[in-house]
Amino acid sequence: MLYGKKQNAADKFFIVPNAVFRLGLSSGEIVVYSYLMCCEDRKTFQCYPSYKTIGSAVGMSVNTVRKYVQALEKKRLISTEWTMVNTRDGRAQNGNMKYTIRPIQEAIDYYDEMQMKRLYAEAARRRAEEALAKYDAKHRNRAV
C-alpha cells in the first residue's frame, strides 16, 4: 500500500498478445500498438490520444505516428474514427482520434489470409515459369 491506498496492478501493467510478434509488424508498429494498448480503457477497448501525444510518448514525429497508425489499421489491429467536440459557444469542432483495439484473432486471420494469397500467387508464378520453360525448350529443339 502506498499512501494508504491499495494499488491495482491492472492500472500499472498491460498485456500485449504474443501473436503480435508473429504478424510481421515493424518495430515502430509494435511501439505504437503497445502505447495504444497502454492507454486503452480495458472495458471499451478504446482510447483517445492525439498523434502528438503518441509521438511524444514513443519518440516519433506526428507524421511517423500517422504512418504507423494507418499500417495498424490496414493490418486490422485497430480501427480509428475522428471525434467531434462542441465548443462553449456551441460550434462543432474536430476532436481527437478515437482508437479501438480490435480482437487479436481478426488480425491473425487477416495475416494468415494474406499469407495464403501470397503463397497461391507464388505457386501460380512458378507454374507459369515452368510452363514457359517447357514451351521454350520444346520450340528451341524444333528450330535446330
Language model segments and positions:
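Charged low-complexity intrinsically disordered patches
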Residues: M1-G4, K74, M97-V144
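General helical secondary-structure elements
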Residues: N8, N18, V62, M114, ...
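Generic detector of solvent-exposed, compositionally biased contiguous segments
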Residues: M1-A9, T64
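Winged helix-turn-helix DNA-binding recognition segment
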Residues: F21-L23, S27-E29, C38-M97
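Short, Lys/Arg-enriched N-terminal segment that forms or immediately precedes the first helix
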Residues: A9-G24
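Functional cleft and adjacent loop/helix regions within the main domain
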Residues: M1, K12-F14, C39, K43
